[in-house]
Structure formats: C-alpha cells, structure tokens
C-alpha cells in the first residue's frame, strides 16, 4: 500500500516522541516527508529543456584571472570559508571510520592534504581561511579525535553535524526507531542538500557572517581536485552570483552524472532520476548534454541564511529505498546541487577536468598513487609527461577492492604514464618498478596465483599466465 498524506499525523506523533532528534531536525524531517507524500515532485517537461548559454555556464578560460597582487588575494581569501562534506564512511573501500582518513599518497590522508593546502594559503597571504567539516552521526566521534592532531596548524577547524533523520518502515510508514530500532541502523543522514539548514542550525553560519565572510566553497572530501580557486571566487563577488556550480565536460564514465539545463528562464540541475524513461539514452549522450556536476559548489552565505529562514530550499526529493536487517525501509534525501534554482543570479562554470579527481575506489587510488601525479604542498598535480588529456581506464577485480589488500598486491605502484587501459581479474600480484603501457589485461585463471615480476615492461598485452610475459 502506497503511503499518503493520511499517514502524516501518525508519523508526526511518533517523531515527537524521538528524544534523539532536535526540534529543528523534527520539523525538517516532517517537512521533507509531507512534501514527499503530497507528491510535489517536480515533473520536467522535456520540450522545455534548453542548453545553457555561456552567460549561464561560463567557460573557465573566459574568467579574468586574479592578479599577482598579494593584497588583492588576501582580500579575496578573507571572504572565504572552505567546507568539506565529511559524512561518508570508508566502508566500500574496506576501511572503518570516516573516508577522509584513508591514506591517499605519501602517508597523507584526504584530510591531511586539505589542511596542508589551506595552511599554505593562510601562511602565504596572512589570511585566516577556516576549514569546516560537515560530519554525519557516523563520522562525528571519530572526526573529533582526528582533528586534534591539527591543533598546532595555522587553520581554524570547525565541525558540525548534519541532521539525523529516522528511517521509515515502508509498509507501516512509521519511524523505525519508534519500533525499537534504536541503534545506528535506525537512522540516516539525509544527503548533502542538508548542508544549508544544518550549517545554519549549527550557529556556524552566523559566526562566519559576523567575521565578514561572504562565500562558502563546498566540496566532497574525496575530490582531490577541489582546491580553492581565486579566479572563480573573484568572478562571483564581482558579478554578485549567489551560487555557482562547477561542471566539467562529460566522458563516457560520467554519463549518469547530473547536468545543468536552462528551464523556464532559470538554471537548474537535471539528474538521471528525473528523466522520463524514454529520454534516458538521450540524457546519457555526450552530444546533447555535454557537462556534468562535479559537486564543487560556491555559495553566498547571506543568501543561504535568507533562503533557510524563509524555508525556501525545497530541493527535489530523492527516495532511497533500502533493505536493512530484512526490513524494507525508506530514506528521503536531497542534493546540494539541486538548490541552484533557488538562488539569484546562479551560474555554472565549466572547469578543467583537473578540478574533478574523486577517489571512490581502489582503481582511483592506483591513479593518484602512480607517476601520473605528483604531490606538492598538498596539491595533487598531473604529470606533464602524460600527453593524453584523459586518464587511463582502470578496472580491478574484487581481490583489489579493499585498500589493505589492494596495497598488499603491489610491491610498488606501476608506472602508468603511457597506459591507456588496465583490466585485472583473479589472484594477481605485482612486483616493483613495473611499467604498463597501452592496453593491458591481466586475468589469472581460477585457483592460479599470477605474479608480474619486478621491472617487467608490459605493453599492449593480454596476460593469462607466466608464459604470456
């Protein structure tokens, strides 16, 4: 039986009894559920979709670069807050605790690199750019302990929690914790669209406004390309853009990513979930929808305050049905990128691919730990010796999924500057100082351990056993 608005009073009284939630969380949750039940999902009329112009999605190279003047740079940085989304766990990569504490390169974690980058800016320009981490209840305790190690760094680190909402038991439409599910599994963080109300409710937003801050740069903590960019910041301040989403050209790997469209005179995010079935292939085409959302967002702090106070941020709801411990539950989420249509003078900026370097799997770790990149001052920079603008495609079998097993299977990370693609399956082990070039496939037969020897140079080969080396 589908839930209707008639289920709302029962749900509301159950939520009132949940002492683990703050009043603002209760009202936020009820508001989200009532919007969902009233079916106010915004339907996209396909014929009204237009490709955004260069005024709406500005090419990065058309923006005026910032001068080398130290005073101008300091003035810009004094208006900035950097916020990293830190709610995710490293479970998919076989790690416990926050994903941001996975070691990326040279013994440094995502969080280490972020702190080093901001500290370098603060030291160089004599400014005080703060770092804010939005945690979830899954990462809050661990993060508090972890940030203690940065006490002596020249970065003010703030943390706050995003909202904690109860999962809803699908068939009865009641909060799971009300039925006795009191452990963490009964709850969920409602997506990063929650960043705006959560920042406001934490009191941090008012603190930053009182310090003269104007913009927050929001990014995923696992995107190594999401570094402070003064050219973008200067453009937004000069043009009074309340919101800016960084987009970048799609490749075949990104066909499911959200894109920016012009719709009824406003810029809007279009996600694959909103696309009618008959248009999904068109949505995935690189010809019509050429860009996708990197989730690097720049947002004016006063505008966030105004919109949150007016309860105006009614982003598209993403229903996320799950089965947990044999119970079918529903969690309702929103995405920060979908907020773009509520801000005045919102734009996209079409940035180089280098600003999108996410580490979602061990195959991404292989890229960033290899000679394809170098690490300088906390910045991961691409090796100029690589002539191909796109990265090699890398597919590693389940034996490499967890970070610890991935690392144990490489004596050292191979050279991949001249690699086009790598596909590895089965019980494969790599020696040290190996060079991979062109298209390489390594597939160990079932039950067979296949070792690639030290200093092997493998170019355009299919390897199924030692005899193929």
From Swiss-Prot:
Protein name per its UniProtKB record: UTP--glucose-1-phosphate uridylyltransferase 2
Domain of life: Eukaryota
Organism annotation: Arabidopsis thaliana (Mouse-ear cress)
Catalytic activity: alpha-D-glucose 1-phosphate + UTP + H(+) = UDP-alpha-D-glucose + diphosphate
UniProt function note: Converts glucose 1-phosphate to UDP-glucose, which is the major glycosyl donor for polysaccharides. Acts redundantly with UGP1 and is essential for the synthesis of sucrose, starch and cell wall, and callose deposition.
GO cellular component: cytosol; plasma membrane; pollen tube
Protein keywords: Acetylation, Cytoplasm, Nucleotidyltransferase, Transferase
One record GO biological process: UDP-alpha-D-glucose metabolic process
Subcellular location: Cytoplasm
Family membership noted in the UniProt record: Belongs to the UDPGP type 1 family.
Annotated positions binding UTP: 85-88, 99, 162, 191, 222, 360
UniProt KW Cell membrane keyword: no
Enzyme Commission code: 2.7.7.9
Record GO terms (molecular function): UTP:glucose-1-phosphate uridylyltransferase activity
Signal sequence, renumbered to the chain: none
Tissue-specific expression: Expressed in cauline leaves, flowers and siliques.
Binding site for substrate: 87-88, 192, 220-222
Entry-annotated residues carrying N-acetylalanine: 2
Gene encoding the protein: UGP2
Induction remark: By sucrose.
Pfam families membership: UDPGP (PF01704)
Observed phenotype of the null mutant: Reduced number of seeds. The double mutants upg1 and ugp2 display severe growth defects and male sterility due to the absence of callose deposition around microspores.
């Amino acid at each position: 039986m589908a839930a209707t608005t008639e289920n709302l009073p029962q749900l509301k009284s159950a939520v009132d009894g949940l002492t683990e939630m703050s009043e603002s969380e209760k009202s936020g949750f009820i508001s989200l559920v009532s919007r969902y039940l009233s079916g106010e999902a915004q339907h996209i009329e396909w014929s009204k979709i237009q490709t955004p112009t260069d005024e709406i999605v500005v090419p990065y190279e058309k923006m005026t670069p910032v001068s080398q003047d130290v005073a101008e740079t300091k003035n810009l940085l004094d208006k900035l807050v950097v916020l990293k989304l830190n709610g995710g766990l490293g479970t998919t990569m076989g790690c416990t605790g926050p994903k941001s504490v996975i070691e990326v390169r040279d013994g440094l974690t995502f969080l280490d690199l972020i702190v080093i980058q901001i500290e370098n800016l603060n030291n160089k320009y004599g400014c005080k750019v703060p770092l804010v981490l939005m945690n979830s209840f899954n990462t809050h305790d661990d993060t508090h302990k972890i940030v203690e190690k940065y006490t002596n760094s020249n970065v003010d680190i703030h943390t706050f929690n995003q909202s904690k909402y109860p999962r809803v038991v699908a068939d009865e439409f009641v909060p799971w914790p009300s039925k006795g599910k009191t452990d963490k599994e009964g709850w969920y963080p409602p997506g990063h669209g929650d960043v705006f109300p959560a920042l406001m409710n934490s009191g941090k937003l008012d603190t930053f406004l009182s310090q003269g801050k104007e913009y927050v740069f929001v990014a995923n903590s696992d995107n190594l390309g999401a570094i402070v960019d003064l050219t973008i910041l200067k453009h937004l301040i000069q043009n009074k853009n309340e919101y800016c989403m960084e987009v970048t050209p799609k490749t075949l790997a990104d066909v499911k990513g959200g894109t920016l469209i012009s719709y009824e005179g406003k810029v809007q995010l279009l996600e694959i979930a909103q696309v009618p079935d008959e248009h999904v292939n068109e949505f995935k085409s690189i010809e019509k929808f050429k860009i996708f959302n990197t989730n690097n967002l720049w947002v004016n702090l006063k505008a966030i305050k105004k919109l949150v106070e007016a309860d105006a941020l009614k982003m598209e709801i993403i229903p996320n049905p799950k089965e947990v411990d044999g119970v079918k539950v529903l969690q309702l989420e929103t995405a920060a990128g979908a907020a773009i249509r509520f801000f005045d003078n919102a734009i996209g900026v079409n940035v180089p691919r280098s600003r999108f370097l996410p580490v979602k799997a061990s195959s991404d770790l292989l890229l960033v730990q290899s000679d394809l990149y170098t690490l300088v001052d906390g910045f991961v920079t691409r090796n100029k010796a690589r002539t191909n603008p796109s990265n090699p495609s890398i597919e590693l079998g389940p034996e490499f999924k967890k970070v610890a097993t991935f690392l144990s299977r490489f004596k050292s990370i191979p050279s991949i500057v001249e690699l086009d693609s790598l596909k590895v399956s089965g019980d494969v082990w790599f020696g040290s100082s190996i060079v991979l070039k062109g298209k390489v496939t390594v597939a160990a037969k079932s039950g067979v351990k296949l070792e690639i020897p030290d200093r092997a140079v493998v170019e355009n080969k299919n390897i199924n056993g030692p005899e193929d080396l």
